[in-house]
Structures are given as C-alpha cells and as structure tokens.
Curated annotation (Swiss-Prot):
EC number in record: 4.1.1.98
Pathway this chain belongs to: Cofactor biosynthesis; ubiquinone biosynthesis
One cellular-component annotation, GO: plasma membrane
Subunit structure: Homohexamer.
Name of this protein: 3-octaprenyl-4-hydroxybenzoate carboxy-lyase
An example Gene Ontology molecular-function term: 3-octaprenyl-4-hydroxybenzoate carboxy-lyase activity
InterPro entries for the chain: UbiD (IPR002830), UbiD-like_C (IPR049381), UbiD-like_N (IPR049383), UbiD_bacteria (IPR023677), UbiD_Rift_dom (IPR048304)
Cofactors (names): prenylated FMN; Mn(2+)
Positions of prenylated FMN binding: I175, Y176, R177, R189, W190, L191, R194, G195
Amino acid sequence: MKYRDLRDFIAQLEALGELKRIGVEVDPHLEMTEICDRTLRAGGPALLFEKPKGHTMPVLGNLFGTPRRVALGMGEDSVEALREVGKLLAFLKEPDPPKGLKEAWKTLPIFKKVLDMAPKKVGSASCQDLVREGADVDLSSIPVQTCWPGDAGPLITWGLVVTKGPHKERQNMGIYRQQVIGPNRVIMRWLSHRGGALDFRDWCEKYPGEPFPVAVALGADPATILGAVTPVPDSLSEHAFAGLLRGSRTELVKCLGSDLLVPASAEIVLEGVIHPGDTAPEGPFGDHTGYYNEVDQFPVFTIERITSRRDPIYHSTYTGRPPDEPAILGVALNEVFIPILQKQFPEIVDFYLPPEGCSYRLAVVTMRKQYPGHAKRVMMGVWSFLRQFMYTKFVIVTDADVNARDWQDVIWAMTTRMDPARDTVMIENTPIDYLDFASPVSGLGSKIGFDATNKWPGETTREWGTPIVMDEAVKRRVDEMWETLGL
C-alpha cells in the first residue's frame, strides 16, 4: 500500500485499527510522553492527540511504534518483506557486473525504475498554503513536546533538516533534534561527521561570515521520513529512494526564502539561517540511552519563516530507555541491513541489533565459518562496511547453529566456545556516539568483538566439544507416543 502524504497514511492506519484519536485534552509537557511510552510498550496504535493543552494544532505520536507500522510506511505489508527493500539497496550499492548481454537486459529495468524516480520539482505546494514571516514567526504556536522532567525545554524531534553545501549539487537531508530557545530560535544538534554539519563547515570555509540557509520539514509523507533513516547508497538520493517506496516521484518545492527544496506535502516547514559563530548550550535531554545527555555547544538556527498546510498536524516523538520509537525503527530496519551485509559478506546468516542495546550499540552476527580467524574478519566488516555501525561498541559473532535473536542461545555459545583472552578483539580510540558518556573522551572510545564460534585447528590445539543431539529415530518415536503420556 502506498501513501500520498502523511494524512493519507493516517487515514489508512485508522482504517486498519493502527491509529487512535485522543479526544481529551493532553499536555505536551510530559503527559504525551507518558501516554506514548505506555502505548508503545504495550504494542499499541499510533496516537493523534486532537486537543493538545494550550494549542489547536493536533499532535501525531507513536507513528512508528511497532515494526509493522514501519513496514507499512515503507509500502510493505510485513516486516519480513523489508528484506526485499534491503536486497534492492544492496544491488544499488554494489551492482553485480552482468555476465552477458541477456543478464544486462534483465538489470536494465531496475536502473530505469531508479532513474524514473528522480524527485519532481513543483511550482506550488500545500506546505506553503499558510505563511508567517518576521515578527509573526512564533514557535509557541506549535505544540512541541517537553518529554522528560529534567529536559532543558521543548524539543523538536522529527524534523527533516535540509541543507546544501557549496561543493555538491545534491542536498542533504538528516534528522537532528532541535531545542526551542525562543520564538524563532532553536539549537541544531548535529554531530560533526553528519551531513548537515559537514555542509555547514564547508559553507563557512567558502563564505566566511555569511548566513547558512537551512530548512526543516515536519510531517512529511512516511516514505520520505523513513528514507532519511535508511542506509541509502551514496549514489541514490533519499528522495529517489522514497519515490521507489511510494511508487511515485517525490514532489519538492523551493523554499520561499532560499533555493533549498523541501517535500511539497509536508505539514510544516521552518525556513531560516544559521549565522556562523551563533551557538548555544544544548541540553540536557533524556535520550535513547535511558539517561540525560551532557550539555554541549551547537549552532543556533534562526527561523525567518514558517509555512504550513491548512490545519497542520505536528509530528512528534520522544526518546528514552528502550524500547522507544528509535528502537522499534531499529528492529524493522534490521531486516533492511541484512541483505546489504550479505551482499558484501555472503557467509553471514543473520544479523541482529537487540533493541535493548540502544538500537545500534550491540550486534549479534551468525555466520558459516570457513577458516581460522574468519569471525574476526566479519567483526571488522561490521564496523567498517556501513557508517550506521560506526558506533557499534560490541559485536558478537557465532556459528550458524546459534539463533542470533535468542539470548539463551547466544550466551550458551559465548560461555562454551570462547576463551576471554584468545577470542576477544579490542580496538581503542575509535569513533563513538557523543551521547555515550561511558566513553573516556567525548566522541572517542573503544570497541570489543567476541568470537563465539567453534574453534578450528590453528585457533586451538585441544579436541573440540561435540554438541549433544538426540537421535532422530528416538525423537520420532517419542513424537508418536507423546499424547499418550499425559504430559
């Protein structure tokens, strides 16, 4: 099923029983977080708060609170079907050279489909139906959530931040949280390696002292939102990928105050600039780790214009100790990652990011081991192949007979197949999430790999244990008599 815009997605979710309207007054200050958190932990529906306290604008929460809704947002009916999305991305990331003319013709439709999904620029759009500029810009008109008691203030969480550096044609689109500090000012928390921060750095080098144009789209269609958090190859734009998911080209419209292009169907768009040198202390905020993060300096985004649809809907979320919405997104996107990894490492059988590991900090890999030291090669591959795993601190590698998604199985393998000195790999001074306060230096820490595979000659001189397995004939006989046993 495909969706034109966020409102179409809301309508379809409601028809499926996957969205509930909340008609009573609920405060965006803390109350929405508690309601969304309880609902998410119960596997409940997306929530449309129709009467946010002190506001007339509805708030959409818990939109991607189950893996199924993530799959639906990607145009699929099940989480399992996301493997096909991953296979497409794996092919586009590293296409196999055709072995002949016949095979070349077979791959041609795939490339044609991608080319046909290039975004379409339109002259007018619903996201610019209403325009507020100058003194009329007031973020207090938007019911921005304050999520936790110790938060520094209201926090915009689902904004798609659009930037463009001076050295490339393509725009960057990323999701960076924004602390509201005034009627027209928010703190843009982007880490130094992220696309928006790199664009800003390059801009400051080429145009020192000049304001840097930025736009933030709130409430885009689900394919565009999910395109911004999916491991899209550098050769494919997020908008083209969203078009593939949606089955139609992404429509973009030029901002009123800059040349940046934003999703035409977005509910709200914030337009403005970042003045070089204008920074402010950001935080603390409760984060996906389950802790409040440190305070640090980040650029301030000055909003010069707010455009929106008529009767806009504000899309929001919260982050907290897993499971939260980012953790659920991780569970679903896990299925997209697997084919991409398998394309590079065919020996990988399964790959699992447990949600309790804060979405990406711990990975379990099962593999078909082929030679001594093979598990260590896979560890290094996980850390280096996709930038999404740059911050993965722990990688556990096991054999294919272990279920990566069953902790009892994984712990059994670790405690029976590992020697701590021989089978751990420690790497120091590697990139680590800025929010990881356990690292000795902000943004720099260590990683550890656990080789929980059966050891081959060359890795051990001892006779290796043989797993206990019941005789199949005995199992069949017991199956036949089971119901007579009264158990």
